[in-house]
């Protein structure tokens, strides 16, 4: 009993509380707020998430806000305990290669060894395991549209049917922006190579080993791996657990919050305590009724 009272007293103290909170943040879950519209369709600006820190191993613990590691990266893979790698199609939280203290959330489009094409039609994926096996494609991507490039079978928008939040604008503005950057000598601002293939211009990238090509579900309003490159495993933080709170922000187009200040900071009750899978079920129901 004396031991339990001592434990209770420690946990009730300021020092004990701080240590417990830090342990939770280091090893279990951390709260983040989504500021941008890059994942709109699935996750919205103003969504407040708990991120599961142990989805892909345990990242090196960092002091919140200043992002200072509390220990060296002995394995040089950014993780105290190495774990599973993000799978294709999963929503992942990570630190992008061009930042050190910012956290992004995107969908993992491709893994190491895969080949990616970004065209005026959308994204194409050539999974490295498939080779040229049509049976592999039909088994893993049933009913998907395919196209042959460089003698290889590529799958068009492979996750769109399963994840209904993924969408493009009709005119694919991002493709034209990237084409403009590439032709004006600003290739340093994009990570994909502009090439001529089968009579059309496409952007191509082969993903390096243990790296991941991260793309926003709002394909035409997303700063992602098309611009700053694929993400190494050492930068992977975790996966969204659930939305614990959600507010409309100034950039919330659905309620025209920029022009109507009264529409800012409205609570989105229907999004609270929903996982990504739960939010996708809502999207499917909404689409089914329209």
Swiss-Prot record:
Cross-referenced InterPro entries: LexA/Signal_pep-like_sf, Pept_S26A_signal_pept_1, Pept_S26A_signal_pept_1_CS, Peptidase_S26
Main location group: membrane
Biological process, per Gene Ontology: signal peptide processing
Subcellular location: Cell membrane
Stretches assigned to the Cytoplasmic side: 1-13
Enzyme Commission code(s) on record: 3.4.21.89
Transmembrane segments: 14-34
Catalysed reactions listed for this entry: Cleavage of hydrophobic, N-terminal signal or leader sequences from secreted and periplasmic proteins
Keyword Amino-acid biosynthesis on entry: no
Keywords, in A-Z order: Cell membrane, Hydrolase, Membrane, Protease, Transmembrane, Transmembrane helix
Active-site residues per Swiss-Prot or TrEMBL entry: 38, 106
MF term (GO), any: serine-type endopeptidase activity
Pfam families named among the record's database cross-references: Peptidase_S26
Topology class, membrane: Single-pass type II membrane protein
PANTHER family: CHLOROPLAST PROCESSING PEPTIDASE (PTHR43390:SF1), SIGNAL PEPTIDASE I (PTHR43390)
Stated family: Belongs to the peptidase S26 family.
Protein name: Signal peptidase I
The species this protein was found in: Helicobacter pylori (strain J99 / ATCC 700824) (Campylobacter pylori J99)
Lineage: Bacteria, Pseudomonadati, Campylobacterota, Epsilonproteobacteria, Campylobacterales
